[in-house]
């Protein structure tokens, strides 16, 4: 039986900065034109990333940025977004009414450069629905491995000698709907398999294990979100507990009525 202890902090008002992060995804003009304009654009930019956006975000100093989704994460394959940009494949995005081609110009290295410029930590959401544990593990290896391997040599050829040290990894996205229509039990099984595939990146003081974040329930459905959470953690508490650093709750405001106040 696994136990979780909640400790009430009396007289302390501390909110972890990571809870105040941001989220970017290829929906509408969030990525293309919004963040990425390309190095040849007439819009002022830093290596293809909009200068005005970077300057504004440097003032905000967001603690963490989540990418590539969202819904798009479950059809995104990271290898499409590395290497010379002119050689990257063009894919298609059908998520949330976008219906646009993705030239994959904004990939892993561009995301990391954006985060480095604005002082944010990256949160990479892996592809659980159309990807595999092997694809996830290779992405982690490419980003974080110190030792010389085929993947780390490829990272160096692509312009980044040192590991990226990506801490946060989202394991699935909205798995109760577009991320696979899973039940809590199904997701718990998949979560165990994926997180068990994560590399540890060393041992002892040198270890840098990924901080895995589970996909939470549909926050806009009060009864379902409670039942989902209970069922998921009931499954997770059986036998050997997998690695779990965080629980990603999703709440939207589109079903809330705007309150009108009289002046």
Regions found by a protein language model. Name each.
Residues 222, 240-263:
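Extended catalytic-interface subdomain
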Residues 1-246:
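Non-catalytic accessory regions flanking glycosidase/transglycosidase catalytic cores in CAZymes
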